[in-house]
């Protein structure tokens, strides 16, 4: 994707594919209104700056995930770039967290901006080494692939004072047992299930 210019990316329709393919069956299940479906058509890919500005406008809290880059961009100064944008836009620190599978980047953020909240991602690709490594507890807060843990382990870890969030968690049964076990946050493709259970973003 590094061969695309920003202008080319901004020309794309980033929403119609969802309406046309219904990848998770949510349209067929009647969980998305026609008004929302109509709003998907012609959606544009936002820049990081545009996303932060919208987050500020709507008073949301956002997870800024620093994505591992392809080989052609391995020397891109990811941490410096995002920190500069945060400062330039006067983004309040209580409105965002910074997360990444690249734990070296998170350590760099900690060093340069210790007041920022960070969350270490674990579990992609789904290798056994990841299942072992995250338990070294280099960080206070983790987001772990649900496939790599159990409610019993979450209960044990949170009782030790660590914050554990889960991703790749999409069933109501999992929501219930992991919330009861003490998970701090849920990252899911089905927030409407959580809303129906009385939880909110």
Name every feature range the model reports, one short phrase each.
Residues 1-117, 137-138, 160:
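Metal-dependent phosphodiesterase/phospholipase catalytic core, i.e.
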Residues 119-201:
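C-terminal active-site rim and adjoining tail of enzyme catalytic domains
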